[in-house]
A protein has these predicted regions:
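Generic structural motif
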Residues: 18, 140, 159-163, 173, ...
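Proteolytic cleavage junctions
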Residues: 170-198
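Long, charge-rich, low-complexity intrinsically disordered regions
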Residues: 53-96
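Mature extracytoplasmic domains of secretory-pathway proteins
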Residues: 24-62, 92-165
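N-terminal, helix-rich and Lys/Arg-enriched segments in bacterial and organellar proteins
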Residues: 1, 167-170
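Sec-dependent signal peptide cleavage junction
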Residues: 1-14
Length: 198
């Protein structure tokens, strides 16, 4: 039988939880303490909190910010008992977007590569946060490729058209300071994924 590590169990629990996509919403800035800043999104009768760290902290000053898209995922930890998300903030679309990026999945075990496959990755925003891309791809890999079960680790590479790439190591959660990074979707050339057998 496959022995699933504690790390894989933790990652699976995080990436398998529900996410919420807010489109064209307004965020309100609140300072909890001088060094701690949150954006609040009002959703019906509840308020969802987004911790602003890194670039987001500088970018979103006091007051009200309109026309935002937000990809919201609860973090494992809480702040003063309240759940919160980190990053995932982009500007709302100026125009409708309906793109497909091709994702290639290579399966590997101790002898090397043994299988590959393709799937379409749907894009409906002009800009996407790395948080959203990382979360959606890992969720798909959990549901369809046994990630954090039979396949324990690997790497996602999002290649850009002209130069550069973004890499996500599948044996660790996306770093908090990358959750607010944003990519223009027209820059995405292709997505390459390697999943490695436990």
């Amino acid at each position: 039988p496959i022995v699933i590590s504690e790390n894989s169990k933790k990652l699976k629990a995080y990436y398998n939880q529900p996410s919420i996509e807010y489109k064209n919403v307004t965020g309100y800035i609140s300072f909890i303490q001088p060094s701690i800043k949150f954006m609040n999104i009002i959703d019906g009768n509840s308020v969802n909190n987004i911790a602003l760290i890194g670039k987001d902290k500088q970018h979103y000053h006091t007051g009200v910010h309109r026309n935002l898209n937000i990809f919201y995922v609860n973090e494992d930890k809480r702040f003063e008992g309240a759940k919160y998300s980190i990053g995932g903030i982009t500007s709302a679309n100026d125009k409708a977007v309906d793109l497909i990026a091709e994702a290639r999945v290579i399966k590997e075990d101790h002898t090397g590569e043994y299988d590959y496959d393709f799937f379409p990755f749907k894009i409906d925003k002009e800009a996407m946060s790395l948080k959203e891309i990382d979360f959606k791809l890992r969720k798909y890999l959990i549901d369809n490729y046994g990630l954090y079960g039979e396949m324990s680790t690997g790497k996602i590479t999002v290649k850009k058209k002209y130069y550069g790439k973004y890499t996500f190591e599948l044996d660790k959660k996306l770093q908090e300071d990358r959750m607010f990074d944003v990519i223009n979707v027209t820059d995405i050339d292709r997505i390459e994924i390697k999943v490695i057998k436990a």
